[in-house]
């Protein structure tokens, strides 16, 4: 029973960590990354469609993304979607390819992005701690129902705490890497 709780806890904490990585990867650095445009929706036959389904996005160089649209009739819609996104990008089309130059980040913008990253990291840690609380509640319920002894409860809570500490450390590592990426010119 305790092993099931630990396994579930680990899976849920891993999901929280992956969600954090996903959120943070969308925060723009000075470097061109295709994942930057992942959140963009394009108007396609009357419905919002993810950009990835109508175009191929590649990093042309360190500061330019190339968007190769599959259907030429969508070029203007894709350009408009990129332009109206809150990323502050200015695309230009050349045939079936749309080039998206990334402007250099100002020092002030970098600081703002670091604040956002730290906030995301704190949310990730809160999610992990909530998973720990749920696991500890389940363990306490087992003790209350006399399915485990107090020693087993204490041991299980210590193990859950070790798992939690490991994931909080991983969150800190992800945050440090992103901050370093944001500060690198």
Swiss-Prot record:
Any one GO cellular component localisation term in the record: cytosol
Gene: frr
Keywords on record: Cytoplasm, Protein biosynthesis
GO molecular function: ribosomal large subunit binding
CDD domains reported in the protein's UniProt record: RRF
Species annotation: Haemophilus ducreyi (strain 35000HP / ATCC 700724)
A biological process term (GO) from this entry: cytoplasmic translational termination
Family: Belongs to the RRF family.
Listed NCBIfam families: frr
Record InterPro entries: Ribosome_recyc_fac, Ribosome_recyc_fac_dom, RRF_sf
Cysteine disulfide links: none
Functional description taken from the UniProt entry: Responsible for the release of ribosomes from messenger RNA at the termination of protein biosynthesis. May increase the efficiency of translation by recycling ribosomes from one round of translation to another.
Protein name: Ribosome-recycling factor
Compartments where located: Cytoplasm
Primary localisation category: cytoplasm
